[in-house]
Amino acid sequence: MSTLGTLSYYADSHIPHENDDHLAPRFSSGPVVQQQSRELTLLEYSEQEPYTFQAKSSIFGASWSPVQPTGASIAYHPYIHHPCSTGDSDGASVRPWALEPLPALPFTGLSTDTHQDIKLEPLVGSGECTTHTLLVAETDNNTTQTERKVPDDAVSNGSHDEKIPAETKLDLDPNNPSSNWLHAKSTRKKRCPYTKHQTLELEKEFLFNMYLSRDRRYEVARLLNLTERQVKIWFQNRRMKMKKCNKDRPKDI
């Protein structure tokens, strides 16, 4: 019923009437053809019952706002009919509404926003494409940055690997007094052996006195360019060495 009503309203709105003066210059060339077309259209739609349409605002409520059909026709034209230049004006005069674009026709009960959504789809697609391109550019920048970092790390690792064998060679050197029999790195400081002059002076001082006072220790350290701690440790080691020698010496019968 809604389809028949729509067609009847559609036909009534586009059938030319007697008092339509604006159609006179359009079809002034064939008055006989106009009369025949009016009779045909009246006979075709006379059997259908008239149907009254309500306003869009009363059906859908106050939330629906009327849309201008002219703006809709400007926004998107899915179908445009190009009339033939054969000179035959019968088809054009019988049904002139067939030449108008589809969005310009006032269909009540149908939303006119569908073509606007269709028009916005390419814009949304283009926006998504731009975001994809931006992401691709960002990933390309990240890959180039990582590719730049990898050679630098490789060069630094290569230089570090070159330094490690040199250090191991120094540790494995038998002439190095800091290396022990396991050839392992020691967390302790390297030994600072005493010079022959320092050793000789310390031996002389030890022969005179096995224990040094604080003042004498300070004087010996200042003369031999040593610290008080070094002088103290040397005297401790020398006393332990003397005790060991006395223990290993055979006792007299």
Curated annotation (Swiss-Prot):
Residues 142-188 are annotated as: Disordered. InterPro entries: Abd-B_homeobox_TF (IPR050803), HD (IPR001356), HD_metazoa (IPR020479), Homeobox_CS (IPR017970), Homeodomain-like_sf (IPR009057), Hox9_activation_N (IPR006711), HXA9/HXB9/HXC9 (IPR017112). Residues 159-172 have a biased composition (Basic and acidic residues). SUPFAM superfamilies: Homeodomain-like (SSF46689). Keywords: Developmental protein, DNA-binding, Homeobox, Nucleus, Transcription, Transcription regulation. Residues 187-246 bind DNA. Disulfide bonds: none annotated. This is Homeobox protein Hox-A9b. It comes from Danio rerio. The lineage of its organism: Eukaryota, Metazoa, Chordata, Craniata, Vertebrata.
